[in-house]
């Protein structure tokens, strides 16, 4: 069963959008780790997580996901540093400055997304489960690879279903 937020996100994906899955590449992991370190150098008390397929060392969309965790009421305290490091936030929608602020940029062929966000508990749990269970991690990578060149909406839906299944187990 998909959540309301998952269904909402899926409804916004164009029908003709395709997904491209690439093999894991150590360079992406190094880029992610360097961005995390850069944030920690400026904000040593902020919890920063590197999650997603690159952090898990599996095939993925060649994107890097970094999460800096903070209470939304403290976002203004951190915003000047993040803008200094990453420029103007990319996400200017209804969520900005409420539950997350997002920066997007490219680095050495990787799409990088940096979030100043309240802790995404479900996402963190899924990441920790996959990191600690090699069998599930392999199933997840196989799922991702099976969607290469196919519908992004179907891919995202399958990932959500996979997440919900492992969270319910």
Show the residue positions of the predicted features:
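Conserved catalytic core of two-metal-ion nucleotidyltransferases
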Residues: 86-120
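Short amphipathic alpha-helices in soluble, non-transmembrane regions
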Residues: 77-86
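Helical scaffold of the NTase/Pol beta-like nucleotidyltransferase catalytic core
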Residues: 1-49, 160-163
């Amino acid at each position: 069963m998909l959540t309301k937020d998952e269904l909402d996100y899926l409804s916004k994906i164009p029908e003709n959008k395709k997904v491209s899955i690439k093999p894991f590449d150590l360079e992406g992991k190094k880029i992610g780790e360097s961005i995390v370190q850069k944030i920690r150098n400026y904000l040593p008390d902020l919890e920063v997580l590197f999650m997603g397929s690159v952090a898990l060392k599996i095939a993925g969309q060649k994107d890097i996901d970094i999460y800096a965790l903070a209470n939304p009421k403290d976002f203004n305290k951190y915003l000047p540093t993040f803008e200094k490091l990453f420029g103007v936030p990319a996400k200017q929608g209804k969520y900005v400055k409420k539950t997350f602020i997002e920066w997007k940029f490219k680095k050495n062929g990787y799409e990088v997304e940096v979030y100043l966000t309240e802790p995404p508990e479900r996402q963190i749990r899924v990441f920790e489960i996959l990191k600690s269970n090699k069998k599930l991690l392999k199933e997840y990578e196989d799922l991702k690879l099976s969607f290469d060149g196919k519908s992004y909406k179907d891919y995202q839906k399958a990932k959500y279903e996979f997440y919900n299944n492992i969270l319910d187990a």
